[in-house]
Amino acid sequence: MLRPALLCLACLAPRPATACETALLLAMDVSNSVDVAEYRIQAEGLALALADPVISEILVQDQIAIAVMQWAGEQRQQLSIGWTSMTSAASVAGLAARAMAMERAFVLSDTAPGPALHAAIDAFGSAPDCRRKVIDVSGDGTPNSGGSPAAARQRAERAGITVNALAIEAPGHGLAVSNFFRRALITRDGFVITARGHRAYTETLRRKILREISRVTG
């Protein structure tokens, strides 16, 4: 399924070098509420989103830098894919392949978005110099460890980092995760997008990344 999308990346025309527009860190929830199949949906969904022709073109055009972090409990965060600049079709294809093959970092762990957000902010210490800094948090549950993320959110705002969130809600249920992210996690300039179940994750993530990397004009 990924192969045709990766082949499309070869169609991207080379572009003149430009300054990095956005440093985007994707923070994936791998806590105990995410089972084996759901983790694979997340990893494969990320790979497919990166290989989307529209997203791929913007990534290269704006020299966007991407990193991927997995998070779970209070002391469980891992930068699984370090900062990678999208300077060519080959670099986008390589990142998509790495996301597809990425092994799960943690199992049987709590859900601690506060410490995860602190770790994501720390990761920008080694990020390329980009005009915008964005953290994209995805998750399917509210915290049961690590306390409130309020201090981490304030820290992100002071650092000029936008925090957005993708809430994975069980089909037919309420919006507990979406409401928590909106109330306690995202920055004032951030947004929340909701996927109804993990099966909707891939398309929702694609729309979310496209929104995050598209330049706002006017």
Predicted regions and their residues:
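Von Willebrand factor
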Residues: 20-82, 85-86, 93-138, 164-177, ...
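VWA/integrin I-like adhesion module and closely mimicked acidic/polar interface patches used
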Residues: 142-183
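Bacterial N-terminal signal peptides that target proteins for export
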Residues: 1-5
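Exposed acidic/Ser/Thr-rich ligand/metal-binding surfaces
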Residues: 108-159, 210, 214, 218
